[in-house]
Amino acid sequence: MLKATYDEANNCWRLNGVKRFITNGDANLHLVLARSEEGTHDGRGLSMFIYDKNDGGVDVRRIENKLGIHGSPTCELVYKNAKAELCGERKLGLIKYVMALMNGARLGIAAQSVGLSQAAYDEALAYAKDRKQFGKAIIEFPAVYDMLATIKAKLDAGRALLYQTSRYVDIYKALDDIARERKLTPEERQEQKRYAK
């Protein structure tokens, strides 16, 4: 676990420790979750920090060899007295900030999954139409056709769930923005409550 201590002489936070499986670990800016409260052992002792690579103090110990998503390196990072700035309020790192980031990331991961599923289905369908067995395309065999039909049904269900969830998020965010400008009507408040779930 990464530990954060306040450096009063330099009026900044210092990060020490190791972080493993960090997405985009080679980025110039890091949002880092670290234990800022001495003697705590749960999420209430964690705060969010911003680290700038130009300030030094962090080494990439290793880059994971992954099966996919090579454009986003997953790294193991070693922080040695790395200068950082507090992001937001102390003790809300996990409870407020990370959970908000994770909820947004989940929708993106769902979209990636639907895209990968579509590509896999397209490949399987093309192969089943092209591959000949006993003088006909294997898609004409009931077992193969049923397999492809099941894949397509699950793909369509996943896409529908993604689109509906995205719609809910968009409506909730729109109502949230409107609420900052003016008071919501009772109907809008009810709708906001419905989409917040």
Summary of predicted features, one role per range:
Residues M1, G25-N28, D42-R44, D59-I63, ...:
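Short acidic, glycine/serine/threonine-rich loops at helix termini
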Residues I22, N65-I69:
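Single-stranded nucleic-acid-binding OB-fold domains
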Residues A34-T40, E64-K66, Y97:
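Generic N-terminal targeting/processing segments that precede catalytic cores or assembly contacts
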Residues C12-W13, L29-L31, G45-M48, T74-L77, ...:
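Beta-sheet entry/capping signal
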Residues C12, N16-V58:
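A short core secondary-structure module
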Residues M1-R14, V18-L29, Q190-K197:
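Flexible, glycine/threonine-enriched loop-and-boundary segments that flank and lead into catalytic domains
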Residues D7-C12, V78, R106-K197:
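Alpha-helical interface subdomain recognition
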Residues N54-G57, P73-A105, D122-E140:
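A glycine-rich, basic-preceded beta-loop-alpha segment at the flavin cofactor/substrate interface
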